[in-house]
Amino acid sequence: MILYEYPFNERIRTLLRLEDLFERLDFFLVQEHPLQHHVALTTLFEVVDVAGRADLKSDLLKELDRQRQTLTALRANPQIDQDALDAVISELETASGNLTATHGKAGQLIADNEWLTSIRSRAIIPGGTCEFDLPAYFAWQHHPAERRRADIIKWAQPLVPLRDATMIVLRLLRESGQSGKVIANAGSYQQMLSGRVYQLMQVRLDESALGFIPEISANKYMLWVRFTQQDGDLRPKPVDADIPFQLKLCNF
């Protein structure tokens, strides 16, 4: 299955972007080539840019606390697996405590490092990190992979609490919805939301439908999924076939 996700608000959009960046950072960090570690470092800069939103930390702390309170109230429910419930509550408390203990803006360690700041400012310029622009960075790229990796891990370490909080919030959000099979008649599907508030929509397609691309939009009254199809280098065109897919609406 191929999964498309659509956030209903800016907060979830920011968390999804952070998740994507952290996954990219993980992928390139374990590689060996200097160019791959260059991508890891520039991805770390992107994480800092996205995480620099002033109210992100407070939003995450509020959400972690709200989830903890909601789940704590379920301890009296005999139909709930109490061991699994306790494990999630403990995870929420740990994530909240670690995030609370962080000081300053996200990525402050990078902002305070003049050398990293110089790389960051040049990295936004096409071809701006050549050896004649940043000879010290060029030399760093020739260190053994283990040393480069250790450096990037050290610089990313202060962002781990933010990452952990982001991951658990998104995980619980995704687990909150129920998936159902629907059909986009003539390539189009719409559904009234009837006043219900959602934060995330998931569209899953079979691998056999890989050529169909969903274009998703929504407001507080209705959601739309329109399928298009790419034909070589041409602009995607609307599809007029009936397309089955899995739809999941998620809200805490």
Swiss-Prot record:
HAMAP family in UniProt: ZapD
Keyword Transferase: no
Gene3D superfamilies named among the record's database cross-references: YacF-like, YacF-like domains
Keyword flag Chloroplast: no
NCBIfam families: PRK05287.1-4
The organism of origin for this protein: Ralstonia pickettii (strain 12J)
Gene it is expressed from: zapD
Full protein name: Cell division protein ZapD
Record keywords, A-Z: Cell cycle, Cell division, Cytoplasm, Septation
UniProt function note: Cell division factor that enhances FtsZ-ring assembly. Directly interacts with FtsZ and promotes bundling of FtsZ protofilaments, with a reduction in FtsZ GTPase activity.
Assembly: Interacts with FtsZ.
Protein family: Belongs to the ZapD family.
Pfam families (alphabetical): ZapD
GO terms of biological process kind: division septum assembly; FtsZ-dependent cytokinesis
This protein's GO CC annotations: cell division site; cytoplasm
Subcellular location: Cytoplasm
